[in-house]
Design a protein with these regions (language model features):
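Long, distal/terminal scaffolding or interaction modules
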Residues: 1-233
Length: 233
């Protein structure tokens, strides 16, 4: 029997947003192969739910599960998981092997995984070798930074994500080796660059897109090694 005869495209209503979405015949074949039921959430809502699993930006005050003192954490205070200060988590004061459990092949894997997850200590956030940068997560070797995440070796930076070796800047996303920048994404090796995207080695410029080696340029795109350009003219 051809797959098209066995499986049909089906339109379902998302249980979350109530919008219709289509499950293709090829999808049904895949679900049957791996023995899982068809989805009840549309792709967009499923994507949001997967994103919700990993939190790097929202920070909370919550009690340390060991000491009871308030710590800064990426985990909401209402979660059942045990959270401890990162210094304790990295120390030799506890043995991770103490939390090991035998796997029961007669029970559902995810039920056992959740039980294990709810008993082992998690570090409240990851922020090693930080100086005056308490409100940062996955931000290694930061100095005088505030609310940055997924970052490395930054100084005096705020409200940024996925940045490397940045100084005196804020509101950046995926920017490297730059200083005095604001509202830039996917840029690197720039100085005093503002409101720009996908630029390299640009200086004293505003509102650029896909520019390289530009100085004192404004509202332009696709420039290479140009100076004093306004709207690509």
């Amino acid at each position: 029997m051809e797959m098209e005869d066995k499986y049909k495209n089906v339109v379902l209503g998302c249980q979350n947003c109530k919008n219709d979405f289509t499950i293709e015949s090829e999808d049904f074949a895949f679900y049957e192969k791996i023995k899982v039921p068809p989805p009840t959430f549309c792709p967009e809502c499923s994507h949001q739910r997967r994103f919700a699993w990993r939190n790097t930006h929202a920070l909370y005050h919550r009690p340390d599960s060991i000491s009871g003192k308030n710590v800064i954490s990426i985990y909401h205070p209402d979660t059942k998981m045990h959270k401890v200060d990162q210094k304790y988590w990295w120390s030799d004061e506890w043995d991770p092997l103490d939390y090991g459990k035998e796997f029961d092949f007669s029970r559902n894997f995810f039920e056992q995984w959740k039980e294990l997850r709810d008993t082992i200590p998690f570090q409240s956030l990851s922020n090693s070798k930080a100086v005056n940068s308490d409100y940062c997560n996955v931000a290694e070797e930061s100095s005088d930074c505030y609310l940055i995440s997924a970052s490395w070796k930054n100084e005096r930076v705020m409200y940024s994500d996925s940045i490397v070796k940045i100084k005196d800047s804020l509101d950046l996303y995926v920017v490297e080796d730059s200083e005095f920048c604001y509202e830039c994404t996917y840029c690197k090796e720039s100085y005093q660059l503002f409101y720009s995207q996908e630029c390299v080695a640009c200086t004293d410029s505003y509102f650029l897109y896909d520019c390289k080696g530009c100085i004192n340029c404004f509202m332009s795109s696709g420039l290479r090694n140009k100076s004093y350009v306004f709207e690509n003219i």
